[in-house]
Amino acid sequence: EAAGITVLFRFISYSFAYFRIFGRRNRLKRMKKLLIPLIAAFAANTVSAAAPQQVIDISTDKVSMVLTAAPGGEVYFRHFGGRIDDPAPLADYKSNRRSDHGTEDLAYPATGGRNFREPALRVTHADGDMNTELRYVSHASKQLSDKNVTETVVKMTDCCQALDVELVFTAYARENVITTHAVIRNREKGPVTLHSFYSSSLPLKADKYLLTHLYGAWAREAQVDHTLLTHGSKSIESTREVRTTHTENPAFLLTLNSDSFSETCGEVIAGALAWSGNFRLNFEVDEFDVLTVLAGANPNASEYRLRPGETFTTPEMIYTHSFCGAGGASRNLHDWARNYGIYHGHEVVPTLLNSWEGAYFKFDAKVLKQMIDDAASMGLEMFVLDDGWFGNKYPRNNSNAGLGDWQVNAAKLPEGIDHIASYAHSKGLKFGIWIEPEMVNPKSELAEKHPDWIVRPPKREAPTTRNQWLLDLTNPKVQDFVFGVFDNTMKLSDKIDYIKWDANRNANNVGSAYLPADEQSRFWIDYAQGFYKVMERIRAKYPDVLIQACASGGGRVEYGAMKYFNEVWTSDNTEALSRARIQYGTSLFYPAVVMGSHVSATPNHQTGNITPIKFRFDMACAGRLGMELQPKQMTDEERQFARRAIASYKEYRDIVMQGDLYRIGTPYDKSGCYGLMYVSKDRKQAVLFTYSLRYQGRSLIPKFRLQGLDPKTGYTIRELNVDKSRNWFDGKTFSGEMLSNAGINPSMPKIYDSGVFLLTAE
């Protein structure tokens, strides 16, 4: 410490000697402005090097995240993984790296200093300075009113500029989840420009890193990819806005110290970003084999000007850790999602019949009433009227016209929506209706009246997707309009219980008539924030209405939207074979309670595939069960089967919605056999789903070792959705130990064979 102080005083002495030798008054003033911040920074570094490191412990029941910092020094990231009861020794941690190769692992690295990795924060300050070096100020932790939740705030400031950053960590003890975001505050005299503003930087050290993430397309969402990370960078990102999760999803699994994926064993970190706009997850492995994960809003074309006194809050990043493989990480996320991440995550959405694939745009009151009658006769609990019910000057008889004109179509429904909703209620069904309030057809009264509300750049054409344009949610007037669409739809009847909110295009060739010309790059952030402002207003007025997030299927499957929505429409592809992979991938990060899954007609309208009614039901029952077909086209045998399957589903629905998920194999396995089971929290009941996804012949006999059961408890197995079981174990009782270690071998010799088995503790 004494040596550091000696060096500091020598530096100050030499500086003032320089002033005496070279100092004209005006030059002296300029040099002081340059040197005094340098002296302050030097002093901070010298003092912090001598001061003891403080340990910042952010822990749950089984997981710890540990930072260290000294006053005026940098904030270091020391650990994320299994819980450490006493992390104090990490105050003395040394990385043994040469300083000229880069800094230690920083909690929130910025452009500046010795950080050579991609920064979490990149800023141009008001005076043009492009460097930022964050220094520790203080930290504090407090338990929230929910005693399960602890919040820790770490305050930092730039060593030379009036720019502050707060890192906010929220620990959920029982769920073993830690979330984090950053708050950036401008105290400078002029505006600063944020070029990169990630939510989180997570440095990790392991021998190997296996990245698991989701990719896909429309009607082929949530396909699973495994990549062994090597030196360099890999990014998962979306630049599409609105429908951000078709091609990539803002979530990942990292298996540490292994190049193989396992459901049951190994150290796994899971992350998911709660953001409905463009996102970016960057994975960078450096020369020390340190992996740094950056996660947050995508900085691409999104420079954000922060005026003096303004703050910018990044989206929330969600992390968990497990030593029990991918399955353990998924269950942690599912528990957190039901308790905190999904709007009313413990509320069950009713089984339903959706009109879309059964009627499309061609319906009237008679058609809808018949569908309602059929839904009631099969035991369904809700009827949802999809697209096509609105527009008069430009009637919504196809996708070319009417979108934006939210008046009830008098030709189709002369007695209005209340007439249909009341009829559904009279049959014992709830009623839901479809809207797409963020969009507009060129052929609409809204487009004629408010061309300035349409997202388009000046002097360029506004391209259409699905024959529609995007409304500019950066504009408060458009936010008012979108809220009004929801509000006025609810006023059509006091018997509307459910809203399906759709969004059928991305954003491209963007431009805003509302934003100033020099702030057009705010569009990508402000659109998502405008969407959230609308949803906040909706939930304040309609806290109990069920709302589904649909965006051409699974285009909004992420935790930013789920804060306001009860469920998502997992995919527009309702074909059961395709759904095996779609629902499997989705389940890695999102629980069954949020997954809409429908039984549709065969041949399927998306793929043309022909599958038996039992296979379609058994697949759909692994999520929130619904139907999407014309019931009058079903055979009597299919109707009878549907009644039985729906009744069975209600018997075990709570286990699927609220239980622990155990995946047994994957739909990618060469065997073509795949299973999953849900186990109640008290382990007294479980439901097992098994599927044959390709022809097995007589040579491949699958065995399923069950998971999550109490080894000392006996479980009686009952096969559902069959007249007579062909399985030798049906109706018999086995210990959880036997079922886990020896397993069972359901008979599934043919493609599209499937089984649903209810296990009950004796």
Q: Model-predicted segments: where are they?
A:
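C-terminal beta-sandwich/jelly-roll accessory domains of carbohydrate-active enzymes
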Residues: 694-762
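Aromatic-lined carbohydrate-binding/catalytic grooves of carbohydrate-active enzymes
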Residues: 344-484, 493, 498
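Glycine-rich, aromatic-flanked loop segments that form ligand/cofactor-binding clefts
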Residues: 112-134, 265-277, 319-342, 380-387, ...
